[in-house]
Swiss-Prot record:
Domain of life: Bacteria
Cellular component GO terms held in the UniProt record: cytosolic large ribosomal subunit
This protein's UniProt keywords: Ribonucleoprotein, Ribosomal protein, RNA-binding, rRNA-binding
Encoding gene, per UniProt annotation: rplO
The protein's role, per its UniProt record: Binds to the 23S rRNA.
Species the sequence originates in: Clostridium botulinum (strain Loch Maree / Type A3)
Region (Disordered): 1-56
PANTHER family xrefs: 50S RIBOSOMAL PROTEIN L15, LARGE RIBOSOMAL SUBUNIT PROTEIN UL15M
One GO MF term: structural constituent of ribosome
Annotated InterPro entries: Ribosomal_uL15, Ribosomal_uL15/eL18, Ribosomal_uL15/eL18_sf, Ribosomal_uL15_bac-type, Ribosomal_uL15_CS
Biased composition (Gly residues): 21-35, 42-52
Protein's UniProt name: Large ribosomal subunit protein uL15
Pfam families to which the protein is assigned, alphabetical: Ribosomal_L27A (PF00828)
Length: 146
């Protein structure tokens, strides 16, 4: 095979539908749009969710809940993610972002107790779960709420 013999795979290039080019083409006259009506017109059709005048599903279902604009959103990290740090490191939210353990700090960092920690670390964060505090202190580390 040579470079000039390269060809697209069978069915990879599909010809566009040429509509409205005579009845013999099979797509003449109404161009596959059926008879008259809203859908046959240029720009015609109904909006998404419209059910022909019947009360639409999104209005038949009850409203539920709300978004509390004052809620604090914490970046959650499990203990096993902190094993990437050396012994004696002071782990701060800035260091976590720098080491790509967390993408964004948001309103602070919350340390959760899933997994085990083998290193002796000083961890500074906005919140800690009870199990996280126990495990960090059992490993000989310190917990500081900032």
């Amino acid at each position: 095979m040579k470079l000039h013999e390269l060809r697209a795979a069978e069915g990879a290039n599909k010809a566009s539908k040429r509509v409205g080019r005579g009845t013999g083409s099979g797509l003449g006259k109404t161009s596959g749009k059926g008879q008259n009506g809203q859908n046959s017109r240029s720009g015609g059709g109904v909006r998404p969710g419209f059910e022909g005048g019947q009360m639409p599903l999104y209005r038949r279902l009850p409203k539920r809940g709300f978004k509390n604009i004052f809620a604090k959103e914490y970046a959650a990290i499990n203990l096993d993610r902190l094993n990437c740090f050396e012994d004696g490191t002071v782990v701060t939210p800035e260091l976590l972002v720098e080491k790509r353990v967390v993408k964004k700090v948001k309103d602070g960092v919350k340390i959760l107790g899933n997994g085990n920690i083998e290193k002796k670390l000083t961890v500074k964060a906005a919140k800690f779960s009870k199990s996280a505090i126990e495990k960090i202190e059992a490993a000989g580390g310190k917990v500081e709420v900032i």
